[in-house]
Amino acid sequence: GNVFSKIFPILYLLGFLFLILAMVDFLSGKEEMKIQQKVNSVIFVLDVSNSMNAEDVAPYRLQQAKNILKNCLQQMHDDKVGIVVFAGEAQSIMPLTSDYTAAETYIDAIETNVVRRQGTDFLKAVEVAADKFKKIPKGSRKIVLISDGEDNEGNEKAAIKEAKNQGIIINSIGVGTDEGAPIPVYVYGQLMGYKTAMNDETVITKRQTEALMSLAYDTGGEYLDGNN
């Protein structure tokens, strides 16, 4: 009996310790679940139409947009990120990943000639992004869309509807200025002049924020001025 009376408190203490460890394990497991649930999947949707070559912001709109995206990457920790580029059509150039170094390399390589068809088709952009979100739970789907908003196909309402159906929140960023600038025309990287209209007048491209604001506010996101 004497041995038992000595061992019993030790067993009791061990049992108590195991209980505490089990509780800690359970709680930290819950904490981990909470953290995992907070992970967002963010798709950068970047306008690569020719007007993004305009130099009304330094050095030019597309480069400013790329710099903004790289700044976004620096604020991210566990979020997954993918990249879609669009003009008159849209294409995915990077699948969702948490490899931010790879993402930066992809962003650096984007130029306006990656999409041939001109225009600014927000619906196609959202559709391609939605396709990438298929395996992602609806509360974690976010788009960061950067565009000058110009020459859009007038289908932002359809794009908003698609985003809402898919549970996607759009945060949009407008680049360019209200005064605008001419659109440089490059051939094999050489500046050949500026885009002209049928009457030979130089076309001035201006930032159009209305559609960008609707895309953000109507999907529960925010609109930001790329110049700030």
Q: Where is each model-derived feature located?
A:
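Juxtamembrane linker/hinge segments adjacent to transmembrane helices in membrane proteins
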Residues: 1-21
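Active-site metal-binding loops of divalent metal-dependent hydrolases
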Residues: 48, 148-149
